């Protein structure tokens, strides 16, 4: 394949999987604003709804490693195509939910599909964009923000004029169209062979060196912070800053709008400069912004600080993936990224519990202050790595 042909193919595949990620994230993020309507319609409690969403997240996290490992041993396409199919089924099931049981099934099936898609699609981009890996992963990661912005608007219209089920069938149809486009463009073979999961080897490889262990700890702290902030930020604004629900939602949407720009930019800067250096800067900016937001109350200042917070922490997503992939062996990128992201998502899932407990028995200021400290620790860990790396180069 000529260089031009490779670049054209890589660009088309970037478009296909990035749009797929954006659409599935749009579908996933519809659940949060539609949850009150779902609870009322199905006659379930908030606790039950929370357990169902937790099941979705657990299934998604658990599927990360095997999907990455199998995509290494077979091909990326062998996992991506079934992932599209499972996602189509999962979102279509939401359209016909008639009770709690079907709601659980739809959530679990969709979580499996998302887990099957997440790592192989990222690994595919890493395969295709060796010199511009950060930029490609940044464009891909921005799909989360596209989905978040779209979900906020669609959910508002849905609860006013339609049933909560209405948006999910169009999501399934869009994913089906993207799957067809992906199959039409794909040049990888589809292969199913007898294989085993070497999770012990993958984990030992990831933690073999202190630098790798420290990187995992730093980004686990980052994901812990994200889980705590994202899930409670609108509630924090309404309960402590006297924001209306509408104003809190609008302020929260700023995070996604900023992320849409910052993620590709951070990835591109990481390709040209130092990924760790950019990550440290982002962590420090987010830590300062998270501390400042607890002591201000004027809406305009909160919007400014919220935007700065987003600038800081949104840089972390493409850089975390790229740093893990940079250090992974060429035949084990999917497995390494899958195992690392399983750890990150586990930390992410603990974040909301931490904020909820601390806010209940103390206050949000202490909870968010603790998250800011986590970011400072993460930045310190990465800064030490950078200093040691520089010293090593000088010693040579």
Q: Which residues does each PLM region occupy?
A:
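C-terminal transmembrane helical hairpin of 12-TM major facilitator-type secondary transporters
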Residues: 273-323
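Extracytoplasmic gate region of multi-pass secondary transporters
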Residues: 32, 211-253, 257-260
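Juxtamembrane intracellular "pre-TM" segments in multi-pass secondary transporters
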Residues: 1-7, 187-216
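Conserved MFS/SLC helix-loop-helix module at the cytosolic interface between two early adjacent transmembrane helices
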Residues: 62-100
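Structural signature of the two symmetry-related core transmembrane helices
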Residues: 78-93, 277-292, 369
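Cytoplasmic helix-loop-helix junction between adjacent transmembrane helices
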Residues: 104-146
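Helix-loop-helix hairpin linking two adjacent transmembrane segments in secondary transporters
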Residues: 131, 139-187
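Helix-breaking motifs and short loop linkers at transmembrane-helix boundaries and internal kinks
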Residues: 43, 75, 94-101, 113, ...
